[in-house]
Amino acid sequence: MGEKMAEEERFPNTTHEGFNVTLHTTLVVTTKLVLPTPGKPILPVQTGEQAQQEEQSSGMTIFFSLLVLAICIILVHLLIRYRLHFLPESVAVVSLGILMGAVIKIIEFKKLANWKEEEMFRPNMFFLLLLPPIIFESGYSLHKGNFFQNIGSITLFAVFGTAISAFVVGGGIYFLGQADVISKLNMTDSFAFGSLISAVDPVATIAIFNALHVDPVLNMLVFGESILNDAVSIVLTNTAEGLTRKNMSDVSGWQTFLQALDYFLKMFFGSAALGTLTGLISALVLKHIDLRKTPSLEFGMMIIFAYLPYGLAEGISLSGIMAILFSGIVMSHYTHHNLSPVTQILMQQTLRTVAFLCETCVFAFLGLSIFSFPHKFEISFVIWCIVLVLFGRAVNIFPLSYLLNFFRDHKITPKMMFIMWFSGLRGAIPYALSLHLDLEPMEKRQLIGTTTIVIVLFTILLLGGSTMPLIRLMDIEDAKAHRRNKKDVNLSKTEKMGNTVESEHLSELTEEEYEAHYIRRQDLKGFVWLDAKYLNPFFTRRLTQEDLHHGRIQMKTLTNKWYEEVRQGPSGSEDDEQELL
């Protein structure tokens, strides 16, 4: 009846005007009484030509991104193929992005095409799609033994060191602005910039230490600090943005500091607790629900639990990055050992592949941004920021290293301190955070974005590119070791990751073997002893002999199937078979 009335209202009969006017008026009143007021649509629906244009634009954006990734993969392959190990992949990919940006600019200048929208980097895409796999993989591939044994030192570098660097850079920018040396920024904006620019890129850092063959504990200190540093930097930046959104005009500096500290502690520990809890729940679920005979379901459950803490944390105003980092560490330490061998390998390789694609995409678009980003370049601001970034890194590394040496058996030498300071490269996270800042006016936002791009490119291209000369300059070993190091140095992350499967992730210990190997050891202390005695047995499944037999059969079947396919391939030959064997 309501639909009929609406039809009468929309299409009045023009032949019987008098009757229909009365009927129309009555029906309009009735319609208004019966039909509810329509609410706003949940999502804006675009139809017709506008929807078609948006679909075409999205398709071109996807095509352009995939094309950039494909070219970058070929570039990385050429680096590995021709053994250009002295050149970090991030440097090569950023350089390629700059070259592609220049070509696109020439094409646009000649009016042959317009790819402005496709080459622009969207910060929301970075934080929702690209950053979570990078952070989760870094936590998942962590060597937990050394990490938990050095958790105190790692936390000191990651939390206090990053905070020191943020305060040095932010405070320096604020006071230089007040002295009219550079453009003025208020205190919260200065601290936000200092926080985002304090995030270091761990890839080149770890390549340096692997090349120097340093102590694995020291390697873990730097790697753990680099991983936690990203999450801490993001939380500090969110803290500064939260203070910006509040009215802080009537609040003293001490009260502002206390509010910032309270916000940071809630974000840090709340997000870490949420990620840890999610990881422990995933371990219990996959311990008591045996999905090992259906690897596709098992792998699907792992992917769900991997992204789950990020969405939940962001939904309740916590840090999704911090949550997904701790979830990755916990899932790797407990959940991973409840998986079948096939899913263990599949999970490692999938995470590495996705993280590589995400990192490559960000570095490529970083190079493209030189020509696509609306810049506001101020030479004095850029120079002072570079000086403050280097000084803030020094104030972070040297005092904390000397402090740690009082409590450590493995001392951090001055040579190592210098290399740690030199290897504080900035990468994808500062760039994306700078685009995500909500600063007014627009000129201030462009100034921060341009300065961040310059600092990132300066550290990646200049510091990253001079990594190999520095290693050779500071290599003071004997001649044989010096010659060996020249051959062994390899800054290709992809080649190293592709050549190995983490052995600690493929543990096949029965209940008796686990007890003999871990629980009866007398040298375990603190959290390591607690974990081996109570936590690990509670959250992980101890394998029976039948489980081990089934896992080995599964792996053998898959290996034989793959080998048969290789032998039957069109390019198979006896020489190839001998090489495989």
Swiss-Prot record:
<dbReference type="GO" id="GO:0032585">
    <property type="term" value="C:multivesicular body membrane"/>
</dbReference>
<dbReference type="GO" id="GO:0032588">
    <property type="term" value="C:trans-Golgi network membrane"/>
</dbReference>
<dbReference type="InterPro" id="IPR004709">
    <property type="entry name" value="NaH_exchanger"/>
</dbReference>
<dbReference type="GO" id="GO:0071805">
    <property type="term" value="P:potassium ion transmembrane transport"/>
</dbReference>
<feature type="transmembrane region" description="Helical">
    <location>
        <begin position="156"/>
        <end position="176"/>
    </location>
</feature>
<dbReference type="GO" id="GO:0035725">
    <property type="term" value="P:sodium ion transmembrane transport"/>
</dbReference>
<dbReference type="GO" id="GO:0006811">
    <property type="term" value="P:monoatomic ion transport"/>
</dbReference>
<keyword id="KW-0739">Sodium transport</keyword>
<feature type="transmembrane region" description="Helical">
    <location>
        <begin position="311"/>
        <end position="331"/>
    </location>
</feature>
<feature type="transmembrane region" description="Helical">
    <location>
        <begin position="379"/>
        <end position="399"/>
    </location>
</feature>
<feature type="transmembrane region" description="Helical">
    <location>
        <begin position="417"/>
        <end position="437"/>
    </location>
</feature>
<dbReference type="GO" id="GO:0000139">
    <property type="term" value="C:Golgi membrane"/>
</dbReference>
<dbReference type="GO" id="GO:0001675">
    <property type="term" value="P:acrosome assembly"/>
</dbReference>
<feature type="transmembrane region" description="Helical">
    <location>
        <begin position="264"/>
        <end position="284"/>
    </location>
</feature>
<dbReference type="GO" id="GO:0015386">
    <property type="term" value="F:potassium:proton antiporter activity"/>
</dbReference>
<dbReference type="InterPro" id="IPR006153">
    <property type="entry name" value="Cation/H_exchanger_TM"/>
</dbReference>
<dbReference type="GO" id="GO:1902600">
    <property type="term" value="P:proton transmembrane transport"/>
</dbReference>
<keyword id="KW-0221">Differentiation</keyword>
<keyword id="KW-0812">Transmembrane</keyword>
<dbReference type="GO" id="GO:0001669">
    <property type="term" value="C:acrosomal vesicle"/>
</dbReference>
<keyword id="KW-1003">Cell membrane</keyword>
<keyword id="KW-0967">Endosome</keyword>
<feature type="transmembrane region" description="Helical">
    <location>
        <begin position="354"/>
        <end position="374"/>
    </location>
</feature>
<feature type="transmembrane region" description="Helical">
    <location>
        <begin position="84"/>
        <end position="104"/>
    </location>
</feature>
<keyword id="KW-0406">Ion transport</keyword>
<comment type="similarity">
    <text>Belongs to the monovalent cation:proton antiporter 1 (CPA1) transporter (TC 2.A.36) family.</text>
</comment>
<feature type="modified residue" description="Phosphoserine">
    <location>
        <position position="573"/>
    </location>
</feature>
<keyword id="KW-0597">Phosphoprotein</keyword>
<dbReference type="InterPro" id="IPR018422">
    <property type="entry name" value="Cation/H_exchanger_CPA1"/>
</dbReference>
<keyword id="KW-0333">Golgi apparatus</keyword>
<dbReference type="GO" id="GO:0051453">
    <property type="term" value="P:regulation of intracellular pH"/>
</dbReference>
<keyword id="KW-0472">Membrane</keyword>
<dbReference type="Pfam" id="PF00999">
    <property type="entry name" value="Na_H_Exchanger"/>
</dbReference>
<keyword id="KW-0813">Transport</keyword>
<feature type="modified residue" description="Phosphoserine">
    <location>
        <position position="571"/>
    </location>
</feature>
<dbReference type="GO" id="GO:0015385">
    <property type="term" value="F:sodium:proton antiporter activity"/>
</dbReference>
<keyword id="KW-0050">Antiport</keyword>
<feature type="transmembrane region" description="Helical">
    <location>
        <begin position="123"/>
        <end position="143"/>
    </location>
</feature>
<feature type="transmembrane region" description="Helical">
    <location>
        <begin position="60"/>
        <end position="80"/>
    </location>
</feature>
<keyword id="KW-0744">Spermatogenesis</keyword>
<dbReference type="GO" id="GO:0016324">
    <property type="term" value="C:apical plasma membrane"/>
</dbReference>
<dbReference type="GO" id="GO:1905526">
    <property type="term" value="P:regulation of Golgi lumen acidification"/>
</dbReference>
